[in-house]
UniProtKB/Swiss-Prot annotation:
This is RNA-dependent RNA polymerase 2. GO terms for molecular function: DNA/RNA hybrid binding; metal ion binding; RNA-directed RNA polymerase activity; single-stranded RNA binding. The keyword Metal-binding applies. Interacts with NRPD1 and SHH1. Associates with Pol IV complex, forming an interpolymerase channel bridging their active sites, through which the Pol IV-generated transcript is handed over to the RDR2 active site after being backtracked, where it is used as the template for double-stranded RNA (dsRNA) synthesis. Interacts with JMJ24. Mg(2+) binds at D830, D832, D834. RNA-dependent direct polymerase involved in the production of small interfering RNAs (siRNAs). Binds to single-stranded RNA (ssRNA); engages ssRNAs longer than 7 nucleotides and initiates internal to their 3' ends. Able to transcribe the RNA of an RNA/DNA hybrid, the transcript produced by Pol IV, if its 3' end is accessible, to generate double-stranded small interfering RNAs (dsRNAs) precursor essential for establishing and maintaining DNA methylation. Its EC number is 2.7.7.48.
Amino acid sequence: MVSETTTNRSTVKISNVPQTIVADELLRFLELHLGEDTVFALEIPTTRDNWKPRDFARVQFTTLEVKSRAQLLSSQSKLLFKTHNLRLSEAYDDIIPRPVDPRKRLDDIVLTVGFPESDEKRFCALEKWDGVRCWILTEKRRVEFWVWESGDCYKIEVRFEDIIETLSCCVNGDASEIDAFLLKLKYGPKVFKRVTVHIATKFKSDRYRFCKEDFDFMWIRTTDFSGSKSIGTSTCFCLEVHNGSTMLDIFSGLPYYREDTLSLTYVDGKTFASAAQIVPLLNAAILGLEFPYEILFQLNALVHAQKISLFAASDMELIKILRGMSLETALVILKKLHQQSSICYDPVFFVKTQMQSVVKKMKHSPASAYKRLTEQNIMSCQRAYVTPSKIYLLGPELETANYVVKNFAEHVSDFMRVTFVEEDWSKLPANALSVNSKEGYFVKPSRTNIYNRVLSILGEGITVGPKRFEFLAFSASQLRGNSVWMFASNEKVKAEDIREWMGCFRKIRSISKCAARMGQLFSASRQTLIVRAQDVEQIPDIEVTTDGADYCFSDGIGKISLAFAKQVAQKCGLSHVPSAFQIRYGGYKGVIAVDRSSFRKLSLRDSMLKFDSNNRMLNVTRWTESMPCFLNREIICLLSTLGIEDAMFEAMQAVHLSMLGNMLEDRDAALNVLQKLSGENSKNLLVKMLLQGYAPSSEPYLSMMLRVHHESQLSELKSRCRILVPKGRILIGCMDEMGILEYGQVYVRVTLTKAELKSRDQSYFRKIDEETSVVIGKVVVTKNPCLHPGDIRVLDAIYEVHFEEKGYLDCIIFPQKGERPHPNECSGGDLDGDQFFVSWDEKIIPSEMDPPMDYAGSRPRLMDHDVTLEEIHKFFVDYMISDTLGVISTAHLVHADRDPEKARSQKCLELANLHSRAVDFAKTGAPAEMPYALKPREFPDFLERFEKPTYISESVFGKLYRAVKSSLAQRKPEAESEDTVAYDVTLEEAGFESFIETAKAHRDMYGEKLTSLMIYYGAANEEEILTGILKTKEMYLARDNRRYGDMKDRITLSVKDLHKEAMGWFEKSCEDEQQKKKLASAWYYVTYNPNHRDEKLTFLSFPWIVGDVLLDIKAENAQRQSVEEKTSGLVSI
């Protein structure tokens, strides 16, 4: 595939090059045919460092015209070099990135950085550089500035995607003469430093490389080099050029160019200069000691979001007004300022105009949200993103509570989640933190200033006004996301106090394990009950030694008595008792399965104990439940390797697509999708609406939600091959405590879906009661992530009456017998909460198995002293460099896609072993380095990395991908939404008119709060904010599924909390059930009735917050109408 940008590039790939050729010979040959000085650079790749050339080369010509002539000569077979006919094709990258058009290579410009002052025409100039080189690389979609400072050369790189507006300007007084261009930026630019000494560069004097200019250096990433941290503080770049009018055609091609010319006045910004490494932050000294921290945090957040400028935020009149308000009033007004779509140049005026209306509304607003959040197990959390040059304060945002923050809830504003990210908020790449320097024949890593910046912030903390946030700990998921918890120590509680409260970590001499254990209690969890030490018994682990390797069959599994399990289930808000809970209890971590014969509350094993702790709160992170089962690319890859035909997967996907096909029009089809794909959530409001008689396309709210569900499913099919496996479940693993199961056997009892209850095909089920059955026969079992063919296990699912008596349900019971535990055979899993893919669909059960991989991990390095915080900080930053999980997974998929042996190929087996080491890196501290030889050179079309060399995949992945694309292409275009929304009179309750004014007030409050969430999270419409499914995501979310998943969770939590708050308004406004029906009907009326649609921005979801009440009204009205019709019929007779 050749992209459009490659044709605008002056570089070509030359094939069929003699392997005896050197750069000088190829240069002379090409310039003999094309003319002198027509080659800018060339390189002949070598298999070893500067020897053994390969049979192709890359050549970068000086112009596109020269490139075209060379391609013509090649097509005419006129480039004959020593009997070798040189063949030219498009290259996917330049050797030296530089503009092809010489007019886009500007020298001697003046670059001024700063931000707007009191209006758009006044520019607060922080720093100015003369003699700057500016390259506009349209092909690379970026602008580069080369700046010389204190004898060093730096490159400032601005991506087109980060430019929010481009303007032509006059800065020298003559309004008719354009002499500058202003770039307004969303994010900070990347900064590089030019380095020549001891760095292995691509261009040096050797036999296989040539460059016309002196490029014997390397750019390495660095932090803000300016003494006043002006780059980090700036949001705009102003470029002063000669003859600006003649440059209009070039600069008007930059993103979001505005036609009118701006007369710009520079204002000295020296007062905003800062020597601190964390910028931009308001100078706390001007605020005074009594200024509330919460308001200071929001002012900084507004500056970082570019809702107000740093100049406006420092205005003493604004500070005086905010200081004179109540804290709650000030925060509400600043939240309204966050909702502005563009920068507010006069926040003083904005605050003054909002004061009266906000105070009036607050008199009728409900009490503090703290109780409501606590009931939902939600906490409010401050966030900070730290980039190489800036800081961004965000929030507070809602997320699931953890035990640590909940225990210190009175200090919740002293906690902060800090994430280290790239300038555009994407994952910070390893080469930004470390580069390889060469000394003689040896290569060693050199840490960059960005590495030192992260390490310094972990050690010194972040100061925001009166608070200094210092490192506290990080959980395993935070480590993978380059995030930590920080805490602002105060007179009552210090960060060290919290760590001591969590437990004793001094016995752990491994840095990586010590760090992991510190983060154990930060897992999102629900706090249930205190369990005294005397109510806990220690039970032995079940272990075996096979071929010198030690295995633990009971690794991570314990027991809970039935009586206590009932109490825990009640605390979790469950109406039933699950078979097992995943828990954190003091220093214990794992799963506790219900034991009906136990009289001790908890029975725990040594394998569950990670550190000593005096905490006695039982924290529950999840419990066993019936979860739908899906294939993904990893599982399909291994099943295909083991002999499952491509047609099987294509047929399963076709069934999935067919199921989705009619859900937007057919009620039964919609019910089928919701009940099959939604697991425990199938009895939700949408299902109730469908069962009540609404057609998918007739009710606007129902139609909107079904459409989102439909599009999400199609997207996941296309991007992940997430194909439903009806004959399967995702189940938490438990152990056979009675020792009944033999090696190779499992016990699986599941809650049946509605489709399974209706189906007559029960050959693989043994019915237990009306809702559950035991699976009988062969099952395929694995655990994600899985890369080795041996991760797929085919086991015998059996019925055993003793397990039925124990009540095990919606979990998989593994044996305690054999040479090795089955969970360990599946990707090195254990029983501390791992979830297993289990399917009894004979179409995807292989007839053969490969031996499982040896998952004996590296031994962690032990220190001869207590682990220090400094060592944990260094481990955190080193992990950022060596986290290769994603790269390894992608490489494995690409090699398996192309190699006839698939996942059994040597490269894939090497990558599976590397992946195992990379997974264990967080515990062992031993990184898994990705060899260059295993890195893919081309990528299959289904990965959609079209900026890279791409090929058409002929494997099962390519077939599945193109089948979904074809299905999407055949979809009917969505009908344009009508101005009028269908109004259902059967939802009217007699007397609802008396509640219309109350309903309007509630509707407007809901609309304002939902709009605020939409703006904050970047949701384009109501359906996106309700589901968290963003169609147009920020680039950093599109690249990182983990980050997107986390944000999606926070969005749904925020909406859930808003709905809970709205329910509070509803309950408070009603005295009895009859009034609830009237108010619910009024909610519906002011939202859907055409007479009220245009009053305010109306959201269809508002009345359906009380959907159960509305459906009761509908049912009663339908029943009343039915009785009246019967009565009328009898009268007529």
